[in-house]
């Protein structure tokens, strides 16, 4: 799946041995009973190199900015597919690396009791690397 599929809580219809399964794409791995045998479904999203998703469905975005490029701006916009996470420049510290957290603004959390539940969202962690060049 794509990041857009994950953000939009898209489902995939899978056919296996004449059986049909509706797969929530924001899950990492699901196991279904397929005519007495376990059917393992792994959802491996297609992600850019600077983005990862952890076991709790939190998104981690790693970005690099030159201090000179952002100094005169009020915000920097960190893109994650179609989502945009604005960071106020005047809240940043002059350190090489820092993390800004966008609580409950990420993907749907995995609910093992109800795999289609999309009511709780994960967090987004933006790790900024500031440089002088």
What residues fall within each predicted segment?
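Intrinsically disordered, low-complexity linker/assembly segments
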Residues: 5-133
